[in-house]
């Protein structure tokens, strides 16, 4: 009986340590005070499809998307953008282009777990807490500050790279996306404004009117919102 109690006590200790370790890793990303997403996202005058999410503008954990449409590979998007996304893909395929959505909507919890996973990866390489945090944030945003939490953004690759390479897919998307209300969200030349380095695969729905203006004038979303709505 005593041995059983000792085993149970040891197991409880291990569980508590594991929980505390995980909580500490998650908490490391909140040690530096961040803007409250619910406070900074006060753009009621903006249409839903122009919601801005970047390092300065976030959405709260309880951000509501009215309805989702399921895609292949366990992906899903805001149902309001699905018809245009599907039409864009259908038209691309008619021209021999083979796009597929690799990443779309992420929950707040998904984003948090992704960030912690990246942090652990760098810690395991021997980096300090500060170094690991800095490296993790280069490839994963704080929860609430990723466009993927809007359900309006998709990462697109080729469904068959032997028949149609990724670059071919991305080039087609960049030339035609505005016709369907999408923009190439993170061009390399706009990285100082967006805070994101070149991502040829990341496309974001903003509506046909805004997309046409943005792509025709080689703007990023931040520049468009400043010009049209005075948002900084």
Regions found by a protein language model. Give the residues of each.
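Extracytoplasmic cell-surface/polysaccharide-interacting catalytic and binding patches
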Residues: 19-232
């Amino acid at each position: 009986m005593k041995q059983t109690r000792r085993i149970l006590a040891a197991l409880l200790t291990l569980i508590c340590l594991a929980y505390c370790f995980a909580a500490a890793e998650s908490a490391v990303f909140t040690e530096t005070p961040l803007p409250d997403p619910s406070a900074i996202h006060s753009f009621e005058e903006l249409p839903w499809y122009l919601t801005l999410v970047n390092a300065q503008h976030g959405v709260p954990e309880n951000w509501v998307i009215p309805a989702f449409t399921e895609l292949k590979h366990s992906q899903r998007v805001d149902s309001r953008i699905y018809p245009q996304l599907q039409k864009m893909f259908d038209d691309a395929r008619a021209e021999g282009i083979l796009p597929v959505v690799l990443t779309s909507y992420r929950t707040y919890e998904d984003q948090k777990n992704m960030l912690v996973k990246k942090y652990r990866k760098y810690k395991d390489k021997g980096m300090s807490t500060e170094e690991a945090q800095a490296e993790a944030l280069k490839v994963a945003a704080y929860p609430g500050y990723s466009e993927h939490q809007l359900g309006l953004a998709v990462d697109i690759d080729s469904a068959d790279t032997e028949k149609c390479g990724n670059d071919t897919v991305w080039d087609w998307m960049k030339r035609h996306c505005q016709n369907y209300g999408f923009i190439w969200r993170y061009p390399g030349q706009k990285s100082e404004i967006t805070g994101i380095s070149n991502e040829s695969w990341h496309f974001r729905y903003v509506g046909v009117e805004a997309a046409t203006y943005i792509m025709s004038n080689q703007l990023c979303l931040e520049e468009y919102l400043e010009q049209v709505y005075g948002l900084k």
